Amino acid sequence: MARKENTFQSELIKEIKERFPGAIVLKNDSGYLQGIPDLTVLWKQYWALLECKRESKAVHQPNQDFYIDLADSMSFGRFIHPENKEDILNEMERSFKIRR
């Protein structure tokens, strides 16, 4: 059984802060801007938008794909769920370090 999205998100925030010391992780309000990804990660001069899903097959809400693609074209944007979490965080780590 898949974990609740908010449980996954809380654990993810802790892991991001461990992997990226000093990172600021902001929870975004989709009520303010429909489809904006759940999390903004700020670390040094880098940033990422991450949309948390409880599982890989979870439905994408309106505009989520647009904002993930836009963020990725500017910096880093991904859908993240328990099955791909390690791959995405590793990719984010590589992406941030490459741009130093």
Question: What are these language model-derived features?
Answer:
Residues M1-R100:
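Catalytic phosphate/metal-binding cores of nucleic-acid and nucleotide-processing enzymes, i.e., regions
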